[in-house]
Structure formats: structure tokens, C-alpha cells
Amino acid sequence: MRIKNGVWARKRHKKWLKLAKGYWGAKSRVFKQAHIAVMRSLRYAYIGRRLKKRDFRRLWITRINAAARQNGLSYSKFINGLKKAGISLNRKVLADMAINDQKAFAELVEIAKKQING
């Protein structure tokens, strides 16, 4: 008797079609197109997880730069002054301070200015 792969093939197809749920047109119903669409979306998701880190760092730097310039210092000089002062806060925390705690951020800018000017 010839053994076929019907049950397992159907399970495999259902798995991919389940991942393609919500896709438009045949991409959610036809296995071959659904499989291609899901593979592409997984690839974009993988790439996106790496781009997200870059995008957030860029956003934090932009926010820090804007807040530092309001207090009379450029971003690069501000970071240099903090390094010289021995203050090691990451950019995520600095950006949060720039938005939510402007007084504390202004104090950090003053500390950085003192370190730069000597």
C-alpha cells in the first residue's frame, strides 16, 4: 500500500495559512502565495527589529540635541562635557529627562558647560 502525506501536508498548510490570516486576497487563502507572503513578512519583521534600535537612538539624540540647544549647548559638546564630568547616563534616560524633567536636564547642561570651559 502506498503511503501518502495528506494529513501532514494539510497540517503544514494550515500552519502557514494561519500565519497569513488577515492578508489581502489570495495571499490569505492560497497556500503557495500565503507561504511566500509570510516568509517575506517574517523577513521584514526581522529587519525591522534591528532598524528599531537605530531609529530610537536617532530619536533620542534628536531630542537631547534640541533640549541642549535650548540651554545654549550643542549635542556633541553636551555629551563631551558629561563624559569629562564622569556622568554616565545613557541617551534613552537623557532624552526622557529632556522631556519630562527639564530642570534636572538644565542642571546637567550647566555641569557640562563647567567641564568644557574649565
Curated annotation (Swiss-Prot):
Keywords: Ribonucleoprotein, Ribosomal protein, RNA-binding, rRNA-binding. GO terms for biological process: ribosomal large subunit assembly; translation. Pfam families: Ribosomal_L20 (PF00453). One of its GO terms (cellular component) is ribosome. Belongs to the bacterial ribosomal protein bL20 family. Binds directly to 23S ribosomal RNA and is necessary for the in vitro assembly process of the 50S ribosomal subunit. It is not involved in the protein synthesizing functions of that subunit. This is Large ribosomal subunit protein bL20.
